[in-house]
A protein has these predicted regions:
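Helical hinge/lid and interdomain linker segments adjacent to catalytic or ligand-binding clefts
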Residues: 1-39, 44, 79-83, 115
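Short, low-complexity, polar/charged sequence segments that are solvent-exposed and flexible
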Residues: 15-18, 44-46, 72-75, 130-135
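An acidic, glycine-rich "communication" segment
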Residues: 33-125, 142
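Extracellular ligand-binding/catalytic regions of CAZymes and related secreted enzymes
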Residues: 123-155
């Protein structure tokens, strides 16, 4: 996500989609460079003065839509996990802490969810490739994924 660049037309289409009830989940972008690049792009769609980015704290309902999520897990890509001997932070100290953030509309409806410094979707994509990766990451990855998707569909 850190390399996303929206055209003027995409900015207008995405803003209209989100303002009409749409939901966007952004996952798998790591470190401050990718975060800053993403913030720059999403700010063209949803100006931060009107739509600030906020941390989703553990009292937010998204943490318990279907499953109780204690905290956002840090899930690496399977290739990084293998190369690094089981490390989870793909940018080392620059991405040591995963973040669960969101952007809400003026009524408090969550429009954008961002899972930064983690790759939740890799927990679903790679389950058949390595049994240990599956055991380490898929249960929590599926729990987060289902909570986010169900929250987006029901709010």
């Amino acid at each position: 996500m850190g390399t996303a660049e929206f055209s003027d037309a995409e900015v207008e289409i995405l803003r209209a989609y989100l303002e009409k009830g749409g939901f966007l989940w952004v996952d798998d972008f790591w470190g401050p460079y990718a975060w800053d690049a993403w913030v720059e792009q999403i700010s063209t769609v949803l100006p931060p003065g009107e739509y600030p980015i906020r941390d989703l704290t553990q009292d937010h309902p998204i943490y318990r839509t279907l499953f109780e999520i204690g905290e956002l897990p840090q899930i690496p890509s399977i290739s990084f996990w293998r190369r690094s001997g089981g490390q989870t932070s793909e940018r080392r100290e620059l991405s040591a802490e995963p973040h669960f953030r969101g952007i809400s509309d003026e009524h408090g409806r969550l429009m954008v969810v961002m899972t930064h410094n983690t790759d939740i979707s890799d927990a679903w994509e790679r389950e058949g490739e390595d049994p240990q990766f599956f055991l380490n990451f898929s249960p929590n990855g599926y729990a987060v994924g289902l909570d986010v998707v169900l929250y987006g569909m029901t709010h």
